[in-house]
Amino acid sequence: MSFSPPNKSADATIQITEMTRQGTPSSGEAAASTPSTSSTESGDKALEALGYTPVFKREFSRWSSFSFAMSISGVYGTLMSTWIYGLQAGGAAAIMWSWIIGGAGGWALAYSIAEIASAYPSSGAMYFTLKFLAPEEQVPFLCWIAGYLNLVGTVAGGASTEYAASQMLLAAVSITSNFSYVPTPTHVVGVMIGLTTIHAMINTLPTAWLNRLTSGYVVFHISVLLGACVTLLVQKRHDMHDLKYAFTNFQPSSGWSPPGFAFLFGCLTPAWIMTGCDGTARIAEEAKNPQMVVPRAIANATTFTYVIGFFFNLVLVVCMGDPKDLINSPSGQPVAQLFFNGMGRAPAIFFTLCGFGVMNLVAIPGIQAGSRTIFALSRDNLLPFSHIWVRISKRSQTPLIAVWTYAVLEIIINLLGLASSTAIGAVFNVCTVALNVSYVIPIICKMVYGRMQKGPWHMGKYSVWVNAFAVAWNTFMAVIFFFPTRLPVTPENMNYAIVVFFFVLIFALVFWYTHGRHYYTGPLTHSPRATDMSVRTPVGV
């Protein structure tokens, strides 16, 4: 396999004088002043204005970018994987209200990310934007911390997706055996290793193949979700619940006081599902007209996920019967058990396998987005041995070494599953906390320093309110997700997310003070600040 060497031209950035910022023209002015160019040229010009030389082929269109964003959330499969958290937090009412409130926080965060991604379309995503949003003297340190948190959150997110997909496949096997087979942690980890390897192999294909793979995802996803809901509702079981039960029946069992506090733990479900919304921003260098296509994909996919997730939750709650039967399911998958109770064996196997299929289609673009994170951080010399991870394959024009590195990291972190279900639960929590903190840092900088130049997609006068809610809610939830979900605390139910998170944070700080501050100056672009912003308004979108 032959590789092209990393771009070394960025090494001279420190010697280049900062260029004068120019005001951002309105969309109409920019459209009038910008010559008619292809969507690829528009994206490349935007990237060059940010200081990077394009190295990826732009294969992702408006539709495939939206489909990619939908696949990152994968609400059918991801909700099946995390529904247990709301169920244990308080049953029906906890599930519904945690989705409504927690989902609103995720929606605000996604829109805040979309707005910033429109202004700075780069594979570095939110980490990279700090170069433009923070004061110059603070950029190196803030980028360093945000970059490492984003990386560990991304790896934890990919790892938890692979683990959840493995659980779902084995749940289908358990149902097939009439529950005589009970999945063990060893079995789940073994399947996870196989799935991760397959998904990494798929990511060695050229971007055009990945574009085709994700393009049909939305149709499949919606069809499966609607099919499952209709099949459940037409059964007319005697133990179906009404809407009052769905929104008012609260069964606390966590030991927390007041009991209503426990419902916050159910917010992990919408947080985990929506928290990877910047994954689409990481393919900005592979998308056509990324200044509009990427933020639209993020915003539309998140809104769709929020709305359709509400109705899917409602159907599951109405049809769930006795919650204790689901929590104690031998398959280890409450929603799979719900399907079995409500539909029968054959349909339950089918829809559980569909969930497994959806999770595969979440994991594949997850590796793509994660490998681009490693590439972007390495391009800026943030990671050890960056010159290795940044290499691009001449055959596929993708960062193959970064792909396999990311896959290996997923496997390593999932080995925690061999310890206990509590330990693997920490992976889900770390994903949400680390990613959300890495997102909140640039949003706070945007609000405090007022340096952001608007891209063509923005929220106008509502921006500050949406940003403020996103920061407040997700900062609050980052603290909540460190709490143990049950009292009294024992070694078995301890939430080890706080241990993992602060281990990474302390490592990043120590590495910064011993090494990073001596050479890392922030994203290595051709110029310290953006130059001609007029290229940000795309043509033909």
Swiss-Prot record:
The UniProt entry lists membrane topology as: Multi-pass membrane protein
Presence of the UniProt keyword Transmembrane in the record: yes
Gene Ontology CC entries for this record:
membrane
Alphabetical list of InterPro entries matching this protein: AA/rel_permease1, AA_permease, Amino_acid_permease_CS
Q: Known Pfam families for this protein?
A: AA_permease_2
Q: Which residues form the signal peptide?
A: none
The main location is: membrane
What's the domain of life for this entry? Eukaryota
What sections of the protein cross the membrane? 66-86, 90-110, 139-159, 188-208, 214-234, 255-275, 301-321, 347-367, 399-419, 424-444, 464-484, 496-516
List, as start-end ranges, the regions of compositional bias called Low complexity: 23-41
Q: What family, per the record?
A: Belongs to the amino acid-polyamine-organocation (APC) superfamily.
Q: Please name the PANTHER family in this protein's record.
A: AMINO-ACID PERMEASE 2, AMINO-ACID PERMEASE BAT1
Name it.
Amino-acid permease 2
